[in-house]
């Protein structure tokens, strides 16, 4: 936060400090203070994004270029909507670039998400039995990109949280295998912890390129990273009748 120095000595950066309110834990106070001083949080407010996470997908797309005008994107775990906002811009879902094809963006989340211009948002438990079919019905065809920023509620136990998010990634990957166009891209947030190795192996079988990235917008003290799998090889053909 930039504030004018009334002493006339020019401008200086002032760090916002939060007093520990009665009943508020010190950890909560420190988190709030970090949020208020986070340059990505400040930038998101200025640029109209719903959260700092928008810059993670921006930075990943700047590096790999998977969000293209005319693209069809599915965003799993889309709340509060930052990734959808970026996707709408990059795939030209609002048709603002008249000489470029218009894309589509479909967002899904367990919690209600405020409407986003240019995106179709649905409230849904993606782990429910009929979730895949519902999303495919809303999509109405194949997708070029499936993105997952899904995360389970934190348990406070690092190992448990790691396994939960890997399970969500695996569910998202299975869905991606079912809906992606050949050559499509899968992007997902994971937490480092060891169990992601099987997911990596699965993705390498189904995509021509798999990269693990920690974008600058991801906090240095966070165990999160992102897997970007590009060049979907396509669904295996069904065996002929009589084949083993």
Swiss-Prot record:
Lineage: superkingdom: Bacteria
Keywords: Cytoplasm, Methyltransferase, rRNA processing, S-adenosyl-L-methionine, Transferase
Listed transmembrane segments: none
Lineage, opening ranks: Bacteria, Pseudomonadati, Pseudomonadota, Alphaproteobacteria, Rhodobacterales
Cellular-component GO terms for this entry: cytoplasm
GO function terms (MF aspect): rRNA (uridine-2'-O-)-methyltransferase activity
Compartments where found: Cytoplasm
Active-site residues from the entry: 189 (proton acceptor)
PANTHER family: RIBOSOMAL RNA METHYLTRANSFERASE, RRNA METHYLTRANSFERASE 2, MITOCHONDRIAL
Reaction equation(s) it catalyzes: uridine(2552) in 23S rRNA + S-adenosyl-L-methionine = 2'-O-methyluridine(2552) in 23S rRNA + S-adenosyl-L-homocysteine + H(+)
Chief site of localization: cytoplasm
Binding site for S-adenosyl-L-methionine: 81, 83, 109, 125, 149
Designated name of the protein: Ribosomal RNA large subunit methyltransferase E
Organism of provenance: Cereibacter sphaeroides (strain ATCC 17029 / ATH 2.4.9)
Entry's family note: Belongs to the class I-like SAM-binding methyltransferase superfamily. RNA methyltransferase RlmE family.
């Amino acid at each position: 936060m930039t504030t004018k120095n009334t002493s006339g000595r020019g401008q200086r950066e002032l760090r916002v400090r939060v007093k520990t309110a009665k009943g508020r834990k010190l950890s909560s106070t420190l988190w709030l203070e970090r949020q208020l001083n986070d340059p990505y949080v400040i930038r998101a407010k200025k640029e109209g994004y719903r959260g700092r996470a928008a810059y993670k997908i921006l930075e990943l797309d700047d590096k790999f270029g998977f969000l293209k005008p005319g693209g069809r994107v599915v965003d799993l775990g889309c709340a509060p909507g930052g990734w959808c906002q970026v996707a709408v811009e990059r795939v030209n879902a609002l048709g603002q670039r008249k000489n470029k094809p218009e894309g589509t963006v479909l967002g899904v989340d367990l919690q209600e998400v405020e409407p986003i211009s240019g995106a179709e948002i649905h409230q849904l438990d993606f782990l429910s039995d009929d979730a895949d079919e519902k999303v495919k019905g809303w999509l109405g065809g194949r997708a070029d990109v499936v993105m997952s920023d899904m995360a389970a509620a934190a348990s406070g136990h690092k190992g448990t949280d790691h396994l939960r998010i890997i399970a969500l990634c695996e569910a998202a990957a299975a869905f991606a295998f079912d809906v992606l166009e050949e050559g499509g891209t899968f992007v997902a947030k994971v937490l480092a912890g060891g169990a992601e190795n099987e997911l990596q192996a699965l993705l390498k079988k189904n995509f021509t390129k798999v990269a693990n990235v920690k974008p600058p917008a991801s906090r240095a003290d966070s165990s999160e990273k992102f897997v970007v799998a590009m060049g979907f090889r396509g669904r295996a053909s069904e065996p002929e009748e009589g084949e083993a």
